[in-house]
């Protein structure tokens, strides 16, 4: 890909994993935000390469990009409890037709099961 650009970015952001996360975030921002004038100049390159080049050139504020990433990952609304009493009863009613299955700890209940490999042939379980 852009090895020279990634090596240049390592001078600014020494941790590769952090670099990948921040460059990905900035590339997504390039795709979603309106920066058409700047992107048209670099039209032949894709957003990940553009973001790496801008990070290497120091055109991107790394602390601000980190803060933007953290803000995007935060949950902004409270999550309701996943299980309501009414909903759990409805789920039980929907699955009443399914047979109850018990598998013992020694898995002896599976001895009479048929296992088929990817060729459609039965596995030999006596081996």
From Swiss-Prot:
Q: Which Pfam families match?
A: RNA_pol_Rpb6
Per its record, what are the GO molecular function terms?
A: DNA binding; DNA-directed RNA polymerase activity
Alphabetical UniProt keywords: DNA-directed RNA polymerase, Nucleotidyltransferase, Transcription, Transferase
Name the GO terms of the biological process aspect: DNA-templated transcription
Q: Which cysteines are joined by disulfide bonds?
A: none
PANTHER family xrefs: DNA-DIRECTED RNA POLYMERASE SUBUNIT OMEGA
- Role, per record: Promotes RNA polymerase assembly. Latches the N- and C-terminal regions of the beta' subunit thereby facilitating its interaction with the beta and alpha subunits.
* Summary of subunit composition and partner proteins: The RNAP catalytic core consists of 2 alpha, 1 beta, 1 beta' and 1 omega subunit. When a sigma factor is associated with the core the holoenzyme is formed, which can initiate transcription.
Protein name per its UniProtKB record: DNA-directed RNA polymerase subunit omega
Give the taxonomic lineage as stored in the record: Bacteria, Pseudomonadati, Pseudomonadota, Alphaproteobacteria, Rickettsiales
């Amino acid at each position: 890909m852009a090895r020279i650009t990634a090596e240049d970015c390592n001078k600014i952001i020494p941790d590769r994993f952090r670099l990948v996360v921040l460059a990905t975030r900035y590339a997504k921002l390039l795709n979603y935000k309106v920066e058409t004038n700047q992107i048209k100049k670099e039209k032949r390159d894709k957003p990940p390469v553009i973001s790496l080049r801008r990070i290497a050139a120091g055109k991107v504020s790394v602390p601000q990009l980190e803060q933007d990433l953290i803000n995007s990952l935060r949950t902004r609304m409270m999550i309701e409890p996943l299980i309501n009493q009414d909903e759990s009863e409805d789920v039980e009613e929907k699955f009443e037709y399914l047979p109850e299955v018990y598998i013992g700890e020694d898995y002896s209940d599976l001895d009479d099961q048929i296992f088929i490999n990817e060729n459609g042939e039965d596995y030999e379980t006596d081996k």
